[in-house]
Amino acid sequence: MKSVIFGLQWGDEGKGKITTYFSKDYDYVVRYSGGSNAGHTVMYEDFKVVHHLLPSIHAKYEVGAIISNGVVLDIEQIVLEIEDYISRVGRIPNLCISNLAHVVLPQHKLFDGLLESVKENNAIGTTKKGIGPAYADKVHRFGLRLADFEVDFKEKWNFISHLYKKLYRIEVEGYDGLLKAYEKIKRYILPHVEIIDLIEQNNVLFESTQGVLLDLDIGTYPYVTGANCNTTGIQNGVGYPVKVEKYMGVFKAYLTRVGNGPFPTEAFEEEGENLRRKGNEFGATTGRPRRCGWLDIPLMKYAIKVSGATELIMTKSDILNGFDKIPVCVEYEINEERVSDIKSVVELEKAKPVYEYFKGWESHNSQSFLDFVNFLEKQLKVKITYISIGPKVDQIVKL
């Protein structure tokens, strides 16, 4: 069995918890895109783990973790995560890392921050973790891979340092730190063909980062991440034409966004602050407050279409417990015309939400909540199979 769990919104949908919950049914969880800009928080009964690069494996089961070639790896960060995992869980994770994964360098992080600062009002609002610059150098064909540490690391480091000095006037230290970090993760690194063998021969759960609407190609460009975090990124992200059977799309019962970009259903002032406070909507990676708003049906339809979602999982419905009424955007008004489907996310800049209001609920057992779920299924034409009813990994209900 090959399945994928991915976000249908702008990230922060609760994919980490959902992936962890289902990971016990698989041999490996595979991260295929992104970098340390991801923040997947998993809460157990007695401790919490935040994954930035480590796949969201269940700490209480023997599940393997694979970081594939599509990930850009901050090797100093992964060392910290492994150490933190060991201290909390009490054992070393069964981790395999592709030797073809590219490395995030100190130059990338510094350049990321500088680029945001000079953009001023056009800034994207990145995490400044160097993800975009690392992918850019990969495309420019002077990126550094894990495999290069065993061949000509010093020569490549000097070349990259020379380029950044000449092109951007950026000079940083980092050679010794990278070497030390590499030595600590060397035991986990495998030739990529062996990664493919593991994927071929086992039941695998692919774990996406961010969300479909942040995908480099079909997201709300330019306010996107540097990677293909849609399900279409799996093939490139593992370097193998894998066949996926289940596409599990995760969405929150409301909507959030970090950074800049269009957000038609954004709630402001007291309304937005109430959602942010109740949902604890602060970034796991940066701590930044998330922009909060209401569920957006036209945008969900778009995300489902481009991702191929075969089933849906709703999270954080419990955050809306006790609300008198729940707004849901069912249509947009664009250029004085009503539309229920969008052809392109470019249209979002002009979109004004048209809301339908639903009676609030006290719990997931309330009839008003079940009516809400039935409405969503009719609108989206995809079955909602599970709902998350709390922050802990086992607080999930099958419908």
Swiss-Prot record:
Residues reported in the UniProt entry to bind GTP: 11-17, 39-41, 290, 316-318, 388-390
Keywords: Cytoplasm, GTP-binding, Ligase, Magnesium, Metal-binding, Nucleotide-binding, Purine biosynthesis
Localization per record: Cytoplasm
UniProt binding sites for Mg(2+): D12, G39
This protein's pathway: Purine metabolism; AMP biosynthesis via de novo pathway; AMP from IMP: step 1/2
Lipid metabolism among keywords: no
Protein known as: Adenylosuccinate synthetase
Gene responsible for this protein: purA
